[in-house]
Amino acid sequence: MHLDEGFDDDLDEERVPNLGIVAESISQLGIDVLLSGETGTGKDTIAQRIHTISGRKGRLVAMNCAAIPESLAESELFGVVSPAYTGADRSRVGYIEAAQGGTLYLDEIDSMPLSLQAKLLRVLETRALERLGSTSTIKLDVCVIASAQSSLDDAVEQGKFRRDLYFRLNVLTLQLPPLRTQPERILPLFKRFMAAAAKELNVASADVCPLLQQVLLGHEWPGNIRELKAAAKRHVLGFPVLGVDPQSEEHLACGLKSQLRAIEKALIQQSLKRHRNCIDAASLELDMPRRTLYRRIKELQI
C-alpha cells in the first residue's frame, strides 16, 4: 500500500487540531489510535503524519485490509514459518512484525474478517505474536493506527466487527469530518490546491469565477478532500470541472459583485438542503433574520 509522503501542516492541523500534541502523546503512552472518516478525508495522510511526529525509529507499515484476500490475510498480517501450509515454501515476515520499532497502519479495518479480528486483538493486548506455523513468541514494539470508512458502532451492532476489538481500538478516536459539512473550507482549500498544482506543473494558476464557485459550493464532494484536490488540478490544466468549462464566456466574467452573489446563493442552498428546507433552522445557522432570508431566496431565485 502506497502512502503520499507530502504533508500540509496547516491542512493537517485543520483536520486534527493539536495534531503534534496528539502524536507525541500516542508515542509516549503507547496507545492505539482509530481514525474514522469517509473516503478522501485524509486518514492516510494523518496516519503518516502521526508516525512522523511521534519520532519512532522504525518505519510506517501500511496494510489495506480490504485489498488482501481472506485466504491470505492471516499469513500476510502475522507472517509464516515454512512449511506452515501447502505453498508456503519459505518463511516470511508479516505486516505486524515488519513494523517492529515503528508504526503499523491498518487501513479499512472495518473490512477485516471476523476470524482475523480475534487474533489481532490478542496481539494488541499482549504486544506479542506467533508466526503462522510457529510456537515461538515474538515480542513487539509497535504503535498501531487503524482507520475505518464506515461506523464501527454500526458494524458491532450488525455483528460484523468484534465489540472487544472495537473497545481496544477506541481509546483514542480521531474523527475526520466530510467536506460537505464544512462548506466554508471548500473555496479556500480549492484555491490552495490550485496554487500547489500550478507550482507542481510549472504553469500559471487560474481564476475561479462566480459560476464555478457556485458549483463548487453546491457539490456534495463524496470523494472529499481527495476529490477537491483533483478538481483543482484539472482546473489549473484548463479542463472542465464539474461541468464548468474554464474557457466559457460566463466563466470569464468574474466581477466582485457577481462572485459575492454566487457565494451567497450557494451557502443558502446548502443550508436549506442540510435542514430539509426548514427556514427557521437555516436562518439560525446563517445568522440571518427569517424575513431577510425569505427575501434573499426570492431575489437569488433559489
Curated annotation (Swiss-Prot):
Residue ranges the record marks as coiled coil: none
Give GO MF terms, alphabetically: ATP binding; ATP hydrolysis activity; sequence-specific DNA binding
Q: What is the lineage of its organism?
A: Bacteria, Pseudomonadati, Pseudomonadota, Gammaproteobacteria, Pseudomonadales
Q: What is this protein called?
A: Pathogenicity locus probable regulatory protein HrpS
Disulphide bonds in the chain: none
Biological function: Member of the two-component regulatory system HrpR/HrpS that regulates the activation of the sigma factor hrpL which itself induces the expression of hprD as well as other hrp loci which are involved in plant pathogenicity, hrmA and avr genes. Probably interacts with sigma-54.
Q: What are the record keywords, sorted?
A: Activator, ATP-binding, DNA-binding, Hypersensitive response elicitation, Nucleotide-binding, Transcription, Transcription regulation, Two-component regulatory system
CDD domains given in the database record = AAA
Q: Which residues of this UniProt protein bind ATP?
A: 37-44, 99-108
Q: Which residues bind DNA?
A: 279-298
Extract the PANTHER family matched here: C4-DICARBOXYLATE TRANSPORT TRANSCRIPTIONAL REGULATORY PROTEIN DCTD, TRANSCRIPTIONAL REGULATORY PROTEIN
Q: Which InterPro entries did the record assign?
A: AAA+_ATPase, Homeodomain-like_sf, HTH_Fis, P-loop_NTPase, Sigma_54_int, Sigma_54_int_dom_ATP-bd_1, Sigma_54_int_dom_ATP-bd_2, Sigma_54_int_dom_CS
**Keyword Nucleotide-binding in record:** yes
Under the heading SUPFAM superfamilies, the entry gives: Homeodomain-like, P-loop containing nucleoside triphosphate hydrolases
Which Gene Ontology terms describe the biological processes this protein takes part in? phosphorelay signal transduction system; regulation of DNA-templated transcription; symbiont-mediated perturbation of host programmed cell death
Gene3D superfamilies documented for this protein: 1.10.8.60, Homeodomain-like, P-loop containing nucleotide triphosphate hydrolases
Q: Where is the Sigma-54 factor interaction domain?
A: 9-237
